[in-house]
Structures are given as structure tokens and as C-alpha cells.
Amino acid sequence: MVYIICYDWPSTSGNHTGMRYLYEYIQKRNPELYKMYTFNMGRRFFDKGKKGKKISVLFTALKLAMAYKSGDKFILTEYLHRDSYQILFAKIIRFICPKAPIYAMVHLVPEKLERRYSKAQMKKSSRFVTEIVTLGSSLTCYLNNLGIENVYTSFHYVDNNYYTPSANLYNRSDDVKVIVMGALARDFEQIAYIVSRLPQIHFYICKGRENIDYLFSGLKNATLVGYVPEAELKHYMNDSDISLNVMKDTIGSNVICTSMATGLAMVVSDVGSIRDYCDETNACFCSSPDDFIEKIMILANDRELLNSLKKMSLKKAQQFSIDNYCASLSSLLK
């Protein structure tokens, strides 16, 4: 049996994204092989307080350790996330079941990891697991440079049965539209500057719960979209042509993969693991605000080039399909 220790985050709960959806999908395909334990990371979980959260994780770890049989494996989906207490989980399993294979997913950018742990603590935490699994080569390199060698580079999945392009993807009659999504390691001040310099282009700024309205005050070409249901967000994606990603870092993300699956041309910061997911056939790589402005204008004025990038985004998204991720996971666990 492969035991999956997963978390239900409010931001992705019930959506076709996130680790919970991924591993529910995997469990449904192979219920005799996978069994998932899910912690609710909404208010109910946090209201338990630090001690209560630890107790919940501790008892689950003890229960599974006592039930362990030779051949069983463990997947931890939020390793090195302090609120998950998965280091505690791994310690317990490793102490009671020293030969148990433990695969621990790490998908926070280095800046966030360093806010939570010293480099020595990260290196020590790697000793409790068989393999650390990342979603991008830049994070793998970062961990390798800390002296952590047991790292496997996977990729971020997308459910391209749900995230599909609009029927009129290549023959839009209206003006080009740009969508901005995601908050992790995003530079909203630069985004506001770009929007201000392109008054002829309309932008959907999907800000979620970020308090950034003041940055776009007076910009009539920007529609600010708060936290909305997944179907509504997909509507905005299907009404757009370009996915704009002004990032300080990326190690693989829902935004990049879902944007490609809906056939959006990618205009992205050339940082982190972005080239694991995009190349020059579907993306314009940028290193400054003026780069972004120039590339968006080029695409807005050249529909043939824009459609070419859209087509290649769709093609590349197939590589990161949820079914390909399932196959990759099976290979890792062998």
C-alpha cells in the first residue's frame, strides 16, 4: 500500500488543481494500491492550535507505523511546510519503520524555505526521507547545493480534461486580452507599471485575496478579479490571449500549466524553473518591465505569431497532463 499524507487548502479545495485533487485522482484509479489521509488546512485545522495540530499528525503517523507491512510506501505532499508537521511525521515513520520508503514533496521557492528553516535544518530533514521530490530543476539545484543529494525532479501536473481552450482560440475578433494570475513570488508593482504603459491592452488581474487595488487605481484597462470559483476563473482564462507572469521565482505552478492547457501565449520572467515548462515556441522570456511591454505589443500586433505561441502552449501542456504525472509517479515508486 502507498499511504498519501495530504492537505486540503482553502485556495484549491474542490478545484481541479492542488495536491489533494491530484492524489484523489490517483487513488480513484488504483484504490487497491493507494490510500489517502487528508488534513483540512482551513480554520478547523488551524483552530486546534500548535499542540492540537501536532497531535493530529502524530497519531496518524503512529497509526500507520503500527500498521506498516513490508512493501508499504509513504508520500508526503507538503514537506518543509511548517504548518503541515510532515517532518514530525517522517521522523516517527523512520524511527518505527527504518526501512520504509518515504517520498517527500517540496514545492516552496527557496526564499520561503529560508524564512522557515536554516540550511542546516533543511539538510537534516532530508535524512528522514528516501527521496525529496521537487517540481522544478531550479529547486533541485538549490537543494543539491545545500548538500542534499536524494532529490528527484518531477513536474507540476495539469488536468487538461478540465482546463481546455475556448472554441474561438485562434479567431478572436476583439482586442487582445492579457490575464495575470497567482500571488506566489509575483511582482505586482512591476505588473501595475506594465499595465499603465499599455492602455490599449485590457488586463484581467486575478488578485485573489491580495490587497493590491491601490496599485491599479485609475487604470481603466485593468479589471481586478478577487477570489472567484474555479469555473469563473476558467472563463476569464478562456476570454484571454496571453498569460502574463511577472515573477521573482518559480518552481512549477498551477498558473503556468493551466495557462498552457487553455492555449494562452506565455509572457514570463526568465527565472527559476520556467524553462522546464516553457520554451521559445510558446513563450516570450523577459528580464525587465520594458521587455514585458515590448513583447506584449509584438504579440498584440502580430496575430499569426500570437496564434503560433497559443498552439505550442497547447502542445506542451500535454507533457504535463495528470495522466503523464501518474505514469511518472509509478516509475518513481518502483
Describe the function of each predicted region:
Residues 155-175, 189:
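Acidic anion/phosphate-binding donor-loop and adjacent secondary structure
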Residues 298, 305-319, 327-331:
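A short, well-ordered alpha-helix in the C-terminal region of glycosyltransferases
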Residues 170-186, 192-195, 204:
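Conserved donor-binding/catalytic core segment of Leloir-type glycosyltransferases
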Residues 129-150:
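A short, active-site helix/loop in glycosyltransferases that binds the activated sugar's phosphate group
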Residues 238-251, 264:
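Acidic donor-binding loop of glycosyltransferase active sites
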Residues 214, 271-285:
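Short acidic/histidine- and often glycine-rich active-site loop of Leloir-type glycosyltransferases
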Residues 207, 212-234:
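Nucleotide-activated donor-binding/catalytic signature segment of Leloir-type glycosyltransferases, i.e.
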Residues 280-290, 298-304:
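Conserved acidic donor-binding segment of nucleotide-sugar-dependent glycosyltransferases
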